[in-house]
Regions:
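N-terminal zymogen propeptides
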Residues: 17-65, 99
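Metzincin-family zinc-dependent endopeptidase catalytic domain
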Residues: 89, 93-216
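Bacterial Sec-dependent N-terminal signal peptides
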Residues: 1-23
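Fold-level signature of zinc-dependent metallopeptidase catalytic domains
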Residues: 50-96, 170-175, 187
Length: 216
């Protein structure tokens, strides 16, 4: 999920670096650890699990596309925030261009990154089935004033099983408790860990920074 949000918009800067704007995702993690110190150990456990998996499993060089079902929850306070489906489709398309490295500006990549730039072989697709097995376009709409100054509170309004879907909440504005940086938070994601609850997992992003059309 962190990777997903970097693709969208985020500035992943070190949280305690001097003269560098803090990252909302890092500050969200710091706040979680402050409220629950066990959160740090869960993060370490996940990293160790990944290291163990990589050490005991051979990595195939064969191309294999991994599909990730996505549900976009539009949380709107009024109709001006209730973005159209076309903007959602556009945002997912841009996300996939960057993940698959098919975006038209790849030739402008800085030399320092050229040796590591690659197709992630990951594709994000709007879900076609909801948690009850019913057909869906992968977009939900919920009217709530929580769209204003949103944070993890919007996740309690609606969320699909985070073990089966990537949840993205699109809101009007974001207010992270404890965020010390100037300006505004465009969006943030949760650092994943084993059995992360749905009330913490996922991405929250302003509709003005979601895609390239409509209100973006």
């Amino acid at each position: 999920i962190c990777l997903v949000f970097m693709i969208f918009n985020a500035d992943f800067s070190p949280i305690f670096a001097q003269n560098i704007l803090p990252c909302g995702t890092d500050e969200n993690l710091a706040n979680e650890i402050l409220r629950n110190p066990e959160r740090q150990e869960k993060l370490f456990e996940t990293e160790r699990s990944i290291e163990t998996y990589l050490a005991s499993n051979s990595i195939s060089s064969a191309e294999q596309l991994h599909l990730i079902p996505v549900v976009v929850h539009i949380i709107y306070s009024n109709q001006n925030d209730n973005i159209e489906n076309a903007q959602v489709y556009d945002a997912i398309s841009i996300l996939n261009e960057d993940a698959r490295r098919t975006n038209p500006d790849t030739s402008n990549l800085r030399n320092i990154f050229k040796s590591v730039a690659a197709d992630l072989e990951v594709e994000f697709r709007l879900a076609k089935k909801d948690p009850n097995g019913k057909c869906t376009n992968g977009i939900t709409r919920t009217q709530s004033n929580l769209s204003l100054a949103a944070n993890n509170n919007v996740k309690s309004l609606i969320g699909w099983d985070n073990k089966k879907y990537l949840n993205i909440w699109v809101v009007r504005s974001i207010n992270l408790s404890g965020f010390s940086g100037p300006g505004i938070v465009l969006g943030y994601a949760a650092f994943p860990y084993n059995n992360i609850p749905g009330t913490s997992d996922g991405i929250v992003i302003r509709h003005q920074n979601f895609g390239s059309i409509g209100t973006a």
